[in-house]
Amino acid sequence: MPRLERNVYKGLITSLSRKKPSNSLAVKESPLLTKFERWSGKRMKLFFESEDSFEHYGLRDLKLPHNMLANKLASPIRAERNTRYRIPKEFLIKLNLYKDATNNVLQLKANFNGVTGLGTTYIHNNKKCLEMKFCDISRWSSRQPLKVPPLPIVADKSALLKDYENQLIRELNECFSKLKTTSKHDHNTVKLYVSTENNLLMDVDTQGSLCINLQSITDKLPHTMLETVTNAPIHISAYSNMDFLTTLHRLLGYYRHRNR
């Protein structure tokens, strides 16, 4: 049997890779998951070859512009201050710094009506969570404009939350005065009622209407609204009362899981 030269053996050994091949497959992650904020706020559409294709797959018009939850989920994504989770901003409270001319300080307040302020950030829209952990104001010093000396930052958690609660109730009362009820009971309507028989916050009835139980916030509702829904359930058009429903859902989320 012929023998190979020593240098041939050496060449074969050194030419082999000592690194074990990886068995894992390289999976490309969708930019919708990794950089979702770049896509938020844009209306995305699905295109089919023809209208017949839409019917062929058994799809129907979901009327998402009439859907309160769909509209909230479609809002731009923002990072929550404490957890850094990226959440649609309609589920968060927007905070800004505002100058208090009287005391010459910067106050941290909830930005409810979109008034321009400094150092925008977002926190959970839930009172119980905020009572346990509020945002650290020491990190805000770099967010104010250059001043010599810089203005001190003041954040009164109790006053901030109380002011936010008052704004929510005031906005809800104003929207309720313009409420448009309907006699229809379908997937385009929302049923408002008060019941102690179940703990469900939201449900969908057999006719497709979204049902919202206001039992958990009866002590926060404006008197006229509470009296109306307590006497009998009311049905409202989802599309015509979107501002009211958005504020109501924000109020429900804020007081969810509170100690009663």
From Swiss-Prot:
The keyword Translocase does not apply. It comes from the Eukaryota. Its main location: mitochondrion. It holds the Pfam family RRG8. Keywords: Mitochondrion. GO terms for biological process: mitochondrial genome maintenance. It is found in: Mitochondrion. The keyword Mitochondrion applies. GO terms for cellular component: mitochondrion. Belongs to the RRG8 family. Required for respiratory activity and maintenance and expression of the mitochondrial genome. This is Required for respiratory growth protein 8, mitochondrial. The lineage of its organism: Eukaryota, Fungi, Dikarya, Ascomycota, Saccharomycotina.
